[in-house]
Amino acid sequence: MRGRITMLGVSRWSEKGGSYSTIERFFNSNIDWGLLNWKFIKTHLIRKKSIYLLGGDEVVISKDGKHSYGLDRFYSSLENRVRKSLAFLNISLIGVDARKAYSLINKQIIKESKEGCVKDKSAKKSKSKKKKNKRGRPKGSGNKDKKEVELSPYLKFVQNTIKEALQWINREVNIVYFVYDGAFGNNSAVQMVKRCGLDIISKLQKNSALSFPNEEKYSGRGAPKKYGEDIDYKNLPEKHLKSDVTDEKSHIQTKIYQMEMLHRKFADRLNIVIIQKIDTITGKMTHVNLFSTDLTLGYDKIVDYYSLRFQIEFVFRDSKQYWGMEDFMNIKKTPIYNWTNLSSFMVNFAHGLRQNHAMKGMSILDLKAHCHGLKYVKEVFKLLPDLASDYLIEMVSAKIANLGAIHPSEKVA
């Protein structure tokens, strides 16, 4: 269909039985999109003996007005500002060999659950001054187990979504790693993912206070020393260097280091990969800290798996550009949920169509042009007498369906 993807637009392009009332009932019905997406992915897109990751990201949908369910002010990375919008958590299955992400489910983020608290406007500030606590550690307090952290409402929301996805996937595909951006570069998020039975691959802050494990011999007095020397990002040990490549055109030298390190706010050791880039002309230097809780994972796979997380952005791009994620005008909870999930399902559906050899090289624009052509041919032949042969219909369909396509189909649909 052309133009804005709304309920009215869908009804106009639908065949018999696709009236506006029918479309409206569809978007107000309860649909298990996660299971539906998984059934489609399992049947048409999964490759045997391939490696798959579970990835997550947030998508922000711009929305004006006042009455949309979940409407609030969220940060948009595209606009680089906070704006009035709807926010969703997306969980996707990422194929390492196919280099593609297949959306499983979108769940709406409500601001209270993201922040972890709800402001109580009725509560008044107490005028009485609180007694100041004494300096230092309270007497009799014990060490806190960093593995037994209390999850915020937002992390519980993410955890429940991951567990829901794993219920379908683990019967067919063995998922080991969960990939997320730097927002999960903290101990609470790491423990949340580990409670789901997965290892995490994410990013730490550039100035993270990492330390090498202590290698000194135990002196025999007191608790054994756990932390060794702190990391110096400008002078990384050469013994941990894994790759050193220089691009002669851009004059950028890329060094990759891998080492097991400790962070005082994390419960366990981390598999750290530092990607250092140096301008060979100016000498300017920058770096990125990636990490995984799997201490046996190689540096190349950590870099590769983390970069594959960006494939989810292409799901968002196609959902917004072609399938109505930015166009819908519904304001109630269920229709909003159905629209966002239908949009991402159509991205999976387009991947499934391209499994057909005749449509393998076609883009989404080509697929839409192809379907437009077939629709026009069908409407034209309805106006003609019943004299057209099947061969004529097939030949005309093949010609018209390829009009406007950049990569035309090799065969008639």
What are the language-model segments listed below?
Residues 2-66, 72-73, 164, 219, ...:
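Electropositive nucleic-acid engagement tracts
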Residues 10, 50-64, 91, 177-185, ...:
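Short, conserved catalytic/metal-binding motifs centered on acidic residues
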Residues 21-22, 78-173, 267-293:
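Electropositive, glycine- and tryptophan-enriched low-complexity nucleic-acid-binding patches
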Residues 27-126, 245-246, 250, 256, ...:
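Active-site-proximal, Lys/Arg-enriched surface segment
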Residues 60, 224, 231, 299-330:
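Short amphipathic alpha-helical "interface-anchor" segments enriched in bulky aromatics
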Residues 124-272, 361-370, 411-413:
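An internal, acidic/charged active-site-proximal segment
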Residues 327-382:
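Basic, amphipathic alpha-helical segments enriched in Lys/Arg and hydrophobic/aromatic residues
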Residues 367-413:
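Long, low-complexity C-terminal extensions of enzymes
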